[in-house]
Amino acid sequence: MFNFINNIQNYSKEAVQAAQYIGQGFMVTFDHMSRRPVTIQYPYEKLIPSERFRGRIHFEFDKCIACEVCVRVCPINLPVVNWEFQKEKKKKQLQTYSIDFGVCIFCGNCVEYCPTNCLSMTEEYELSVYDRHELNFDNFALGRLPSMVENDAMVKNMKGLGYLPKGVIESHASS
């Protein structure tokens, strides 16, 4: 009889513990139900990228000294730098500069190690094209100023996903 009572006590303890685990699962589910959805309606809603977002690379032709540091630090030797040595000035003269964004991994090494800061990362992430050869940007395309998501009047800006942190997420542009 004593063994039977012990079995009933153990069973009831395990049943209460199982109910607690199920209750914890429901609490997590209800917590996630109260949050904003993660999915955004992309063409009409856009996320404002974070402050350190690594998007398209912006290039300033006048600042470049054709030192080719960007090519040496690139893990895939991507930037193509064409220059010509001018004997009278004893200096390199930059002819063309290009980056193929179809191959670029957006690591940011070229931007970080550039001695003249002629390269910078922008917040532009819409680089989709039908032909991959259009992703090969020359110095004119790289010099184009980026379009800011915040200035697009046709788009409802999303300040953040709101999924991981609770509360309101402020964009870096408004602070």
Swiss-Prot record:
Binds 2 [4Fe-4S] clusters per subunit. GO terms for cellular component: chloroplast thylakoid membrane. Residues 55-84, 95-124 form the 4Fe-4S ferredoxin-type domain. It is a peripheral membrane protein. [4Fe-4S] cluster 2 binds at C74, C104, C107, C110. GO terms for biological process: photosynthesis, light reaction. Its cofactor is [4Fe-4S] cluster. It catalyses: a plastoquinone + NADH + (n+1) H(+)(in) = a plastoquinol + NAD(+) + n H(+)(out); a plastoquinone + NADPH + (n+1) H(+)(in) = a plastoquinol + NADP(+) + n H(+)(out). One of its GO terms (molecular function) is quinone binding. Keywords: 4Fe-4S, Chloroplast, Iron, Iron-sulfur, Membrane, Metal-binding, NAD, NADP, Plastid, Plastoquinone, Quinone, Repeat, Thylakoid, Translocase. It is an enzyme of class 7 (translocase). The keyword Iron-sulfur applies. Its main location: plastid. It is found in: Plastid, Chloroplast thylakoid membrane. Disulfide bonds: none annotated. Signal peptide: none annotated. Its EC number is 7.1.1.-. The keyword Iron applies. [4Fe-4S] cluster 1 binds at C64, C67, C70, C114. Belongs to the complex I 23 kDa subunit family. NDH is composed of at least 16 different subunits, 5 of which are encoded in the nucleus. PANTHER family: NAD(P)H-QUINONE OXIDOREDUCTASE SUBUNIT I, CHLOROPLASTIC (PTHR47275:SF1). NDH shuttles electrons from NAD(P)H:plastoquinone, via FMN and iron-sulfur (Fe-S) centers, to quinones in the photosynthetic chain and possibly in a chloroplast respiratory chain. The immediate electron acceptor for the enzyme in this species is believed to be plastoquinone. Couples the redox reaction to proton translocation, and thus conserves the redox energy in a proton gradient. This is NAD(P)H-quinone oxidoreductase subunit I, chloroplastic. The lineage of its organism: Eukaryota, Viridiplantae, Streptophyta, Chlorokybophyceae, Chlorokybales. The gene is ndhI.
